[in-house]
Regions:
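Acidic, glycine-rich A-domain
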Residues: 1-175
Length: 175
């Protein structure tokens, strides 16, 4: 909860706004959600796949996203990077929307989680992806700039701005 709103509900609203905008512009995109419980149990779910039209099924999948367990961001970034590398497009963007610091119950806490996520971001960029991070974590100034780098992240301590901000961030990052 943040500012009397469930963070996940606001994130889902922001995803809906963004996917409607991208679909209206004809920009091919996919949406993935992830959760983890140890390094051997990282789940990345496809909410909307590339080429899949935005319709009632996708909207229901977005609305059905539930809170997961832990936030092993590095593994999720590597998984989605592999999918994006398969895409034939010249411009490929990986936008990471998260509500917290990289963590898990098996030593993926603190410095290790931050360094692994930072390395996954570097690997994605080396593979030709543009990567941009978005978070609503009020403490993100302590680690988010280090993970994503200068000009490649946005921190929203006021969560109510997120739904309008995601489409604006996309326009800014892709111009």
């Amino acid at each position: 909860w943040l500012q009397e709103q469930r963070v996940l509900d606001v994130e889902k609203g922001a995803l809906l706004a963004l996917t409607h905008g991208l679909s209206a512009c004809g920009d091919e995109h996919a949406i993935f959600a992830f959760t983890s419980r140890r390094r051997t149990s990282v789940s990345v779910a496809t909410i909307k796949d590339f080429g899949e039209p935005l319709g009632a099924k996708v909207i229901r999948r977005i609305q059905a996203i539930k809170p997961g367990q832990y936030t092993r961001i590095g593994a999720a970034v590597r998984h989605v990077t592999a999918k994006l590398k398969e895409r034939p497009h010249r411009h490929r963007l990986l936008m990471v929307l998260t509500d917290g610091k990289p963590n898990d119950i098996d030593q993926y806490e603190g410095r290790y989680g931050i360094e692994d996520t930072r390395m996954a971001i570097r690997e994605a960029r080396k593979a030709g992806l543009r990567v941009f991070g978005v978070t609503v974590d009020a403490h993100a100034r302590e680690y988010f700039p280090y993970i994503f780098g200068r000009g490649a992240y946005a921190i929203f301590p006021s969560i109510d701005r997120l739904p309008a901000a995601l489409p604006a961030i996309y326009r800014h990052v892709t111009r």
